[in-house]
Amino acid sequence: MRIGVGVIFTYIGLVIFLTGVNVGFMPIGYKLGVALAEMNPYIVTGLGLLMGVLVVLAEPAIHVLNQQVEEITQGYITRRSMLAGLCIGVGAAIALSMVRIIFDFSLAYYIIPGYFISLALSLFVPPVYTAIAFDSGGVASGPMTSVFILPFAIGVCVGVQGEAAVLRDAFGVVALVAMAPLITIQLLGFRAIVHNHIQEKRAMKRILDAADQQIINFM
């Protein structure tokens, strides 16, 4: 009975979501991209950064993932740090996508160094950060990115380069959004390692200073 009710609610939610996508999100994203690109193409870079932050804040799956990570790690990795890392990563990815559309260069200039950096970081950070980073990449490139950011990027490309360049320059934004958390979340892990190392050095220094003071007092 509960499964049947769940299926019905899921179907109704899917119908409402797809209706909103086709009637609202996709047309608005496309028209907004065209209008802003024709007005001032360079403004879309900063706007892309802002949109990335808003997409992360509006994506329900991201909040679910952040909550699960905080619970499983018992607060070692907080929701706030995860949310900050994803906001920075996704915002930067969309902004860089706008730069690529404006200056018309290959996606490989982002993808190859990006995955090289993410794989290099995986050699140094704790495995939990690498696993969370890859899951975050899949979650961040969810419905909000596909139904609003991608049409927005297509609109920007049409406004800057023309319709002929859409297949060459507009697509790839979702790939960058999926790649960005691989770097930013693992950078959180690298930061945690550096922070722990500094704390250990400070603790050792306090112990040595206390031991030296005891020796001086004894003498």
Would you name each region that the model predicts?
Residues 45-122:
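Helix-loop-helix junctions within the multi-pass membrane cores of secondary transporters/permeases
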